[in-house]
Swiss-Prot record:
Gene: add
Natural source organism: Yersinia pseudotuberculosis serotype IB (strain PB1/+)
Active site per the UniProt annotation: 200
HAMAP family found in the cross-reference section: A_deaminase
NCBIfam families: aden_deam (TIGR01430), PRK09358.1-1 (NF006846)
Coiled-coil region list: none
Binding site for Zn(2+): 12, 14, 197, 278
Enzyme Commission number: 3.5.4.4
Name of this protein: Adenosine deaminase
Family affiliation: Belongs to the metallo-dependent hydrolases superfamily. Adenosine and AMP deaminases family. Adenosine deaminase subfamily.
Catalytically driven reaction(s): adenosine + H2O + H(+) = inosine + NH4(+); 2'-deoxyadenosine + H2O + H(+) = 2'-deoxyinosine + NH4(+)
Length: 334
């Protein structure tokens, strides 16, 4: 269950993986695009997971229709704003939304820096309207190669004040972290916090690489860490958090069942691991499902679920003062 005395967070939530089906339909019609269906009910199977996908890359293809309709910077601004609205309606007090500006710009050749500006603007408007604390994580989409990632990094750093952290996502097997060392050196020099998708499609060596070569402070998914006892020891000792996404890991065939998911093992090993969604609109789930359905099915006790909820705030890329302010806001002590 969700503890109402603790801030509810989602620190692994893709903005460009959370574009509403209705918005895809609206924007598709606005820009005269040939969508796979012209009614909401018939469009959903094309933009939402309806069965377990065979691998991560197949899962990621479900995201493509969402960004295919981003025909203008105003469209990017709209989906950013709606992401904040969705987070607030899900009951979140704090979220870190991550996005790939290159991926969002690609289909309609939008200016990448313009996409970053539009997303920052949409998030700021949403935070004002819905009274929620949202931070942005810029993604380098490794699937598109080193040069595209340099363009993304340049655009993100041009708006450093609106970006909290940098992530590496996409085809983990085809584009290992070692290709992006110089990108992350620049990001760290600019003061960005670092999280990296690792140990989702590739093995523990990908997580070691993210830590040693890219400077990862947190690991996205990190499922394969369970295969390396020394790695789990290291994660626990150095408080390198794991952003767990339970339902997502089933849908991508990263784990075969919730019962075999390693989140409970991580928590019992002393690793700071949290519960998150990943791509809510594509997955057809929200954060409540992960706490009320997925976490118990993954073998977490009520105490462990509460610990994972507390870990979400502990892992957040904000100051200790900001964390305490959130605690006081949610459960004021008179």
């Amino acid at each position: 269950m969700i503890d109402p005395r603790l801030p509810l967070t989602d620190i692994h939530r893709h903005l460009d993986g959370n574009i509403r089906a209705q918005t895809i339909l609206d924007l598709g019609q606005q820009f005269n695009l040939n969508l796979p269906a012209n009614e909401l009910d018939t469009l959903r199977p094309h933009v939402q997971i309806t069965k377990t996908e065979p691998d991560l890359v197949s899962f990621l293809q479900k995201l493509d229709w969402g960004v295919a309709v981003l025909g203008s910077l105003d469209a990017c601004r709209r989906v950013a704003y709606e992401n904040v609205e969705d987070a607030a309606h899900a009951g979140l007090h704090y979220a870190e939304l991550r996005f790939s500006p290159f991926y969002m710009a690609m289909k309609h050749q939008l200016p990448i820096t313009g996409v970053v500006e539009a997303v920052i603007d949409g998030i700021a408007s949403g935070c004002r309207d819905f009274n929620i604390d949202i931070r942005l994580i810029g993604i380098l989409s490794r699937t598109f190669g080193e040069q595209a990632c340099l363009q993304e990094l340049d655009s993100l750093l041009a708006h450093r004040e609106g970006i909290t952290a940098l992530d590496l996502a996409g085809d983990e097997l085809g584009f290992p972290g070692s290709l992006f060392r110089r990108h992350f050196n620049r990001a760290r020099d600019a003061g960005l916090r670092i999280t990296v998708h690792a140990g989702e499609a590739a093995g523990p060596e990908s997580i070691w690489q993210a830590i040693r070569e890219l400077g990862a402070e947190r690991i996205g998914h990190g499922v394969k860490a369970v295969e390396d006892r020394k790695l789990m020891d290291y994660l626990a000792e150095h408080k390198i958090g794991i952003e767990s996404c339970l339902t997502s890991n089933i849908q991508t065939s990263t784990v075969v069942s919730l019962a075999t998911h390693p989140l409970a093992t991580f928590l019992r090993h002393g690793i700071v691991a949290s519960i998150n969604t990943d791509d809510p609109a594509v997955q057809g789930i929200e954060i409540a499902n992960e706490y009320l359905v997925a976490a118990p099915a993954a073998g977490l006790t009520p105490h462990e679920i509460r610990q994972a909820q507390a870990n979400g705030l502990e892992m957040a890329f904000i100051s200790e003062q900001e964390k305490q302010a959130l605690r006081d806001k949610v459960f004021p002590i008179s």
